[in-house]
Amino acid sequence: CEALKDLCGDGIAECVRHIVGVQFRNQATIGGSIYGRFGFSDVLTAFLALDTFVELYDGGTIRLSEFVNRKPDKDILLSIIVRKSKRKFRYDSIRQTKTDFPVIACSVVTGMVHGKETWYFSVGARPMKAALLEKQWEIPADASEEMIADYARQAASEFTYGSNMRGSAEYRQHLAEVLIRREMTSILAEGR
């Protein structure tokens, strides 16, 4: 979708690129991925960081971060609402093989919210469903690598991680820190 590409760059394309196999990827939908609230969902991780809203038939319009934490029900997802605002968006994931589920998936978004610079961090495949962290950090554009690494460490440490056959909780936290640092560095290098 050109509107999403204009708003988010190549981040959304990156989050759907790894969906297992061409046949499945051509049938998968953004709505189905978000409604399912799957722990391995790249799409949920990306849209959660974009401060997205969902419109439900019975539940009305609520933030995606609230919807993710609701118990599964029989409500119908009508639409997904992404705010159109000037923000920088990055998404990345680590996989053991190209078409495997992610070991960890991270998304970082920054922009002005109510006059304050706000950073949104979403980490999925922890192996729990994606979670969102919001920070009002004013990071200088010329921030040093050490300063960015400290911010990334702090953000990654505020998520809960678990272990399964793809990796331990400690391994996932380390990977999340690395991905968050890379994404923050990329955003700061591009300029806001």
Predicted ranges, named:
Residues 1-192:
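C-terminal structural segment of proteins
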